[in-house]
UniProtKB/Swiss-Prot annotation:
Gene (name only): DYF13
TPR repeat start and end residues: 57-90, 151-184, 393-426
Organism annotation: Chlamydomonas reinhardtii
The name this protein goes by in its record: Intraflagellar transport protein 56
SUPFAM superfamilies, per database record: TPR-like
UniProt keyword list: Cell projection, Cilium, Flagellum, Protein transport, Repeat, TPR repeat, Transport
One of the protein's GO biological processes: intraciliary transport
């Protein structure tokens, strides 16, 4: 029997056609996008469907949901408001709108919108957060009492602890939830790492992040936190390198996120701060604080005060920054009220149970005592954290002055000389304290050389006074005589002449005792005869000349 080949050939062609049809790319379903958390893809699909059918309310709900989770809360809010305009809307849309408003930083509006919705756990959480943001502790405690042991409520409580700088309490909640729901809440590991970062345990934070990033290397939040740890431990360049890795993994899309843009400003030492930070307002909360810091670094104290004067501080960084602004304003204006407020803010942080044993807490107590001029106490706190600031010019500036103010001149000189920043080295305060240390350490010549480097102005005049009086007190009479001589030339006041005469006699006594070279006598006599007051100095000169003649000293 012979079989026809025509049917098998036709069947083969049919199978090929079907296979080709099956291989055509399918349009992904919404569920696929949501499973992958590809909210941008979901938004594209839902927007396309919306154009096809604008009356599909379920499609609109999903579009709002995806906008919200993609971080475009303003667009989600517009859709929820549209949904509320339809007949017999779901009252939960009020609660969802409140969530959008909260993330947009509109906390009062979020509270009002949430109260229009039905009583539910989500409403309570939004009201709880809004009360915290508005600083209403009575409402905060009331809503706290309504929280349950559910995962969502406990995560909310941990978040509030974090916002109130109760990082250990937040960590305890996160760890407990991780033990109970390890597979379900893996991302909570990042929150634990965030708390350790805030507690200054940067190495612990990095260790925790390492485990998470090995599974999710493109996590924007985790990579950003790793960058922050590197910034704290190393420098801005090391931090920025981590963000470049994130950019490569994400195709650069994450770099447009407000948080990343904010952190890049910080990592780059304030570069583009005035372009990036003002539009951010308080999202993230550090944006306003970093803008204040930017103004302070550029000596724009008025602008910094304008940003912070109406802010009610609630976290240690806010209290510290407010203290710094008041301290700088008090120094610029000579206003003791601002200095008093600064001292009080520093004390609030440094004496608090949560901060007293932290590095910032001890810095605050040192600053508090600095403003009170209790320098022995300043040294107690600065010495306890010295190992963390070995090459820090700001730290050495404060430590050096505190040591000098307590009479520890040798240590003060060593500390002040470690400062490399010209901003400090060119300040009169630095020059005057270093000059005093030189004199007290028997190096009056170095103090005089510092004076010779200055231009003639009020600061050089003040330094002359310091050199004249300190050298006289320490028995460095030759340089005291030189300083009083210049002072007399600038201002022929009788006290400068008397000072010069006394210093000249002291220098002569040192020469006679063999503690100064005899050749110095020629300079001393020249100083006494140099001004219009030479006649008043002639009796002293006569005694000196007689001694020189008797002792074979050529003048």
């Amino acid at each position: 029997m012979f079989y026809s080949k025509s049917r098998p050939q036709h069947a083969a062609r049919t199978n090929v056609a079907q296979a080709a049809a099956n291989e055509k790319p399918k349009v992904p379903e919404l569920e696929e996008f949501l499973t992958k958390r590809d909210y941008l893809g979901a938004i594209a699909l839902l927007s396309f469907r919306r154009h096809a059918n604008r009356n599909d309310l379920k499609n609109l709900e999903w579009l709002a949901y995806c906008y919200f989770h993609y971080g475009e809360h303003d667009k989600a809010l517009v859709i929820y408001k549209e949904l509320l305009q339809h007949e017999d809307p779901d009252p939960m849309f009020f609660v969802y709108s409140a969530a959008c408003l909260y993330y947009m930083g509109m906390y009062k509006e979020a509270e009002e919108q949430a109260l229009q919705g039905p009583k539910c756990a989500l409403q309570t959480r939004i009201l709880f957060h809004s009360a915290q943001r508005q600083g209403n502790d009575d409402k905060l405690m009331a809503y706290h009492g309504q929280l349950t042991d559910s995962i969502e409520d406990q995560l909310t409580l941990a978040s509030i602890h974090y916002q109130r700088s109760h990082f250990q309490e937040a960590t305890d909640i996160y760890k407990r939830l991780l033990l109970e729901h390890r597979d379900y809440l893996r991302s909570t590991v990042v929150y634990v790492a965030l708390c350790y970062c805030k507690l200054d345990y940067y190495d612990v934070s990095l260790e925790i992040l390492g485990v998470y990033l090995s599974a999710f290397p493109d996590s924007a939040i985790a990579v950003n936190l790793k960058a922050c740890n590197h910034f704290r431990m190393y420098n801005g360049k090391a931090a920025e390198a981590e963000l470049k890795t994130l950019a490569e993994l994400s195709g650069g899309q994450h770099l447009d996120h407000d948080l990343i843009r904010h952190n890049l400003v910080v990592f780059r030492g304030g570069e583009n701060a005035l372009q990036v930070l003002p539009p951010l307002s308080d999202i993230p909360p550090e944006a306003r604080l970093n803008l204040v810091i930017h103004h302070l670094r550029h000596h724009e104290v008025g602008e910094a005060f304008g940003l912070i004067k109406d802010m009610e501080p609630s976290t240690p960084p806010e209290f510290i920054l407010k203290a710094v602004v008041h301290a700088m304003l008090g120094q610029v204006k000579g206003d003791p009220e601002h200095l008093k407020k600064a001292q009080q803010y520093y004390q609030l942080v440094g004496a608090s149970a949560s901060e007293c044993d932290t590095i910032p807490g001890r810095q605050c107590m040192a600053s508090c005592f600095f403003l009170l001029k209790q320098f022995e106490d300043v040294l107690v706190f600065l010495s306890s954290i010295k190992t963390y600031f070995l090459n820090d010019d700001d730290f050495n500036w404060n430590l050096g002055i505190a040591k000098a103010a307590t009479g520890k001149y040798k240590e003060a000189e060593e500390t002040l000389l470690q400062i490399a920043n010209d901003k400090y080295r060119n300040e009169y305060t630095y020059t005057s304290w270093l000059a005093r240390c030189y004199i007290m350490n028997g190096k009056a010549r170095l103090a005089w050389e510092r004076y010779l480097q200055l231009e003639t102005n009020d600061e050089s005049y003040q330094l002359l006074l310091l050199i004249a009086n300190d050298c006289y007190k320490m028995g460095a009479f030759y340089f005291a005589c030189k300083a009083f001589d210049v002072l007399e030339r600038l201002d022929p006041a009788p006290e400068y002449l008397e000072g010069k005469k006394g210093a000249a006699c002291g220098a002569f006594q040192m020469i006679v005792a063999g503690k100064e070279p005899k050749d110095l006598l020629r300079d001393v006599i020249s100083l006494l005869r140099g001004n219009n007051s030479a006649d008043q100095c002639e009796p002293i000169v006569a005694v000196m000349r007689k001694w020189a003649k008797n002792n074979g000293v050529k003048l």
